[in-house]
């Protein structure tokens, strides 16, 4: 969908990526963000995802594009990351960490894995799904987002995209593997982990999508 493409483009734009940077792409999926980083400048990427299928598809792309020296894939959930301290210049996660229920330990691990001055760049949905599942105010808050996304899904992808978004929307409402928080909450999580500077960038034309850059 157009919104996700633009979201990933904004992540790369505000990341401050430089030549020869070491990057960790969390929740890499089929590699769209990793490949965008490489089109921006020469860098080395470690890409992780909990899905064996996503990693397999991305690995096929890497081999087809002759990028085995530039991208290394690992099948690993964000909660189980085990990298050396001060290893990466940039750690990115786009529409991935809202699947993590207990976010603080993951953010602290990200902080520890970054070099001094390194950046954590997160692209996410600005939606707060915390609270009691049966709380009316919480439900209305989530529906404000879902109404726009359902319309956008139908417009950009037709009935099939609408059905996928409808099913996903129920997961957001019930916190069924989806645990979104708002960007004020993301900012607090980053500051509590030790990040010195936190900036949030809106995605023009898509009020629910934003990008946060936290600098160590």
Language-model regions, residue ranges each:
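Conserved alpha-helix/loop element of class I SAM-dependent methyltransferases that forms part
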Residues: 2-19
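Class I SAM-dependent methyltransferase SAM/SAH-binding core
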Residues: 24-26, 30-80
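A conserved beta-strand element that flanks and buttresses the S-adenosyl-L-methionine
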Residues: 92
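Short catalytic micro-motifs in class I SAM-dependent methyltransferases
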Residues: 95-96
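A short glycine-rich, Lys/Arg-flanked "PGG" loop and its adjoining helix->strand segment in the class I
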Residues: 104-116
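Conserved beta-strand signature within the Rossmann-like core of class I S-adenosyl-L-methionine
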Residues: 118-124
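C-terminal alpha-helical "lid/dimerization" subdomain adjacent to the S-adenosyl-L-methionine
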Residues: 125-191, 199-200
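Core SAM-dependent methyltransferase catalytic element
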Residues: 193-216
């Amino acid at each position: 969908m157009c919104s996700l493409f633009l979201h990933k483009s904004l992540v790369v734009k505000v990341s401050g990526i430089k030549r020869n940077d070491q990057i960790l792409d969390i929740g890499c999926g089929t590699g769209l963000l990793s490949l965008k980083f490489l089109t921006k400048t020469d860098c080395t990427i470690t890409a992780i995802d909990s899905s064996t299928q996503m990693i397999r598809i991305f690995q096929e792309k890497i081999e087809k594009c002759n990028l085995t020296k530039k991208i290394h894939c690992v099948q690993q959930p964000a909660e189980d990351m085990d990298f050396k301290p001060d290893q990466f210049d940039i750690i990115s996660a786009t529409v991935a960490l809202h699947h993590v229920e207990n976010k603080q330990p993951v953010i602290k691990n990200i902080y520890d894995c970054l070099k001094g001055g390194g950046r954590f760049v997160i692209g996410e949905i600005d939606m707060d799904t915390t609270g009691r599942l049966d709380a009316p105010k919480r439900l209305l808050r989530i529906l404000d987002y879902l109404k726009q996304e359902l319309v956008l899904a139908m417009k950009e992808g037709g009935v099939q995209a609408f059905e996928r978004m409808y099913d996903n929307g129920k997961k957001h409402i019930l916190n069924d593997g989806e645990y979104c928080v708002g960007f004020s909450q993301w900012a607090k999580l980053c500051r509590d982990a030790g990040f010195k500077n936190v900036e949030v960038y809106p995605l023009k034309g898509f009020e629910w999508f934003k990008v946060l850059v936290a600098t160590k």
